[in-house]
Amino acid sequence: MPRKPQQPRAHATVGAIVEAGFISLARNGVENTTTRHIADIAGVRVGSLYEYFANKEEVFDAMHEHMVREVVGMVRPLIPTLVRMDIRELVAELLYRFRDLLERDDGRYLRYMSYAAYFAPRGQIEPINRLLMDLLMKYVMHHPQLVRLGNLPAMGFIMINGGVFTVIRYLTEPNPTVTFDDLVRGLGDMVAHFVDGELQRAGSAD
């Protein structure tokens, strides 16, 4: 039965296996990634991998937890700055940061995210959802006129997830027809136009 790492050396081994999982996934895809591929890239015996993971799916789970920590670690320190930005600046900052994270280390995180929807444990995404809702609520506190928007949590969820999917789709396109800067401006305009329109509608109803 796989065990949890206790000693620093064991933690280092598990970390190497998880990083190797990202590399193997980028090279071989989901179906063709095997525990042997992962172990070889990590520089450990397959038996050592099985000390901590029962199969490649458990490695994928650990990769997802790692990715969630990376996203949370990227966004959380930015919140005090993000909440003071206007809508377009906020969208641009988040999208550029997200792109930089995905393209780091030869794009291994990008390849993972392009597959993640197929096998990522849904419950493990909750820390990101909580963080983004916290960002949304704090943003509204700094921009109290937004309280008048109807169904704000639902629209925030749709726009955040839609933006993430759009960035991943763009970055995995071999020959995109627009620049990333244009994409960011377009998404920022879409969110800003929605907010402005809803605020005008709310004002007309008063």
Language-model-detected regions and their locations in the chain:
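Short glycine/proline-centered loop/turn elements that form peptide/ligand docking sites
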Residues: 1-6, 23, 32-34, 42, ...
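Helix-turn-helix
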Residues: 12, 16, 24-58, 62
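Hydrophobic/aromatic-rich alpha-helical bundle segments in the mid-to-C-terminal region
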Residues: 110-114, 122, 142-190, 201-206
